[in-house]
Amino acid sequence: GRTPIILLDIPGTVDGNILMYGHLDKQPEMEGWEEGLGPWTPVMKDDKLYGRGGADDGYALFASISSILALKEQGIDHPRVLVLIEFSEESGSPDLPHYMELCSEKIGTPDLVVCLDSGAGDYKRFWTTTSLRGLIGLTMKVEVLTEGVHSGGASGHVPSSFRIARKLLSS
């Protein structure tokens, strides 16, 4: 079996398509908790909640729905919003490509993707991340000739396949 996903489709009042992505799985429990605190029983202490995953983006589903409700309460129009919540992000999202393909027609082409998963510099204040770097894996093959030639005899006449690859990757 595959890990589950939650896919919410919230109709919009204006054109557009937003995809909000988050996860609900957590890192494995850790050792080294203070006395009276631990991974399995949530504890309120000094107006803070302590427990496993308390600061690991468990808010994704709540935050996405709350943001749409806040817009509705204020009478602010919003585009269609799809909320995709997965349960295998901490394991490298092995099932996410399957679900993205399975749901591709429903998801369509988002105008904006909001990632509900980021880091925090400390636990004393709220943090907002406005952009993330992406990652892509690919196999690239650049061919410039049908047969090999010595660089001393073709340098300057034959384009460098490495230079072409660098140009493609930097575009």
PLM feature spans:
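Acidic/histidine-rich catalytic neighborhood of metal-dependent amide-processing enzymes
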Residues: 55-131
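Short, conserved micro-motifs enriched in small and acidic residues
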Residues: 49-62, 90, 155, 159, ...
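Residue-level signal for secondary-structure boundary sites
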Residues: 16, 28, 91, 122, ...
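Midchain, well-structured core segments that form catalytic/ion-binding scaffolds
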Residues: 97, 105-171
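Acidic/His- and Gly-rich active-site-bordering loop/insert found
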Residues: 1-52, 71-78
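Fold-independent oxyanion-binding glycine-rich loops
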Residues: 22-24, 46, 87, 116-119, ...
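Broad gene-expression machinery/nucleic-acid interaction feature
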Residues: 5, 80, 135-137
